[in-house]
Regions:
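Helix N-cap at the start of a conserved alpha-helix in ABC-type nucleotide-binding domains
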Residues: 167-169
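Conserved ABC ATPase signature
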Residues: 131-135, 139
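ABC ATPase nucleotide-binding domains
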Residues: 218-247
């Protein structure tokens, strides 16, 4: 179980996340995180993985999430990647297995076999020796996904994986995400394209500083729910406004 209770985050004087409480079983499921710009979507993920110092309870498998990071893989927005760093596609992907084999060990046969399969599945074979600075947006995103899949995690966080990429790359990436779901993994994806929300996600978290809704993707994309999320703001100093949704 992935759980938060009364999660609050301040960045400077801004109250970015207000009293977020969630309870999500770790099972084969793809969950979207959606809301307007500045709603706190990326901040929620960064709070969960410890990049931001949010207050409140954060648990994975009934233990503090900071003690369980070996079970989590995070794929940041590709815009945050340093493209000037001299590293090849193959080296980036192989770095995904270092938390399991150690930073100073050569990848074993199992890792090499997995690399070969991922290069094939994500159509990166001809790019394996390219520098990441030479890649298109879609190619780079496929590399980041391949890197994430080198590790055996239970929970995957993806921050806007489909922004600025071609349809072919999006389709390849979504196929791998569906495969993770079939393996019983929990995948949470920050996403902005409402037209594909019902197609991609089993359930959706609607966020705008507070938790506006968490549940069925059909209901989440209804006019009523979207208006509540995208067109309003709530003063959550009032305890009655606290979000506490368990599914």
């Amino acid at each position: 179980m992935l759980e938060t209770k009364d999660l609050n985050l301040f960045l400077g004087n801004k109250h970015v996340l207000k009293n977020i409480s969630l309870s999500i079983p770790v099972r084969g499921e793809i969950i979207g995180i959606m809301g307007p710009n500045g709603a706190g979507k990326s901040s929620l993920i960064k709070s969960l993985i410890g990049e931001f110092n949010a207050t409140g309870t954060k648990l994975l498998y009934n233990k503090p999430i900071q003690q369980q990071l070996q079970h989590i893989t995070y794929i940041p927005q590709k815009a945050h990647i340093d493209l000037d760093f001299p590293i090849s596609v193959e080296q980036v992907i192989l770095s995904g297995c270092y938390k399991e084999i150690g930073w100073f060990r050569r990848p074993n046969k199992s890792a090499r076999d997995k690399l070969k399969q991922l290069l094939s599945d994500l159509e990166l074979e001809t790019l394996r020796h390219r520098q990441i600075s030479e890649l298109s947006g879609g190619q780079l995103q496929r590399v980041l996904v391949a890197r994430a899949l080198m590790s055996e995690s239970e929970v995957y966080f993806l921050d806007e994986p489909f922004v600025g990429i071609d349809f072919s790359s999006e389709k390849l990436i979504m196929t791998k995400i569906e495969n993770l779901k079939q393996q019983g993994k929990l995948i949470l994806i920050i996403h902005h394209d409402l037209s594909k929300a019902k197609q991609y996600f089993d359930r959706i978290i609607l966020l705008n500083q507070t938790l506006r809704y968490f549940g069925d993707s059909e209901e989440a994309t209804s006019v009523t729910r979207l208006n509540e999320t995208f067109m309003s703001s709530t003063d959550c100093s009032d305890p009655s406004q606290r979000s506490n949704i368990t599914c």
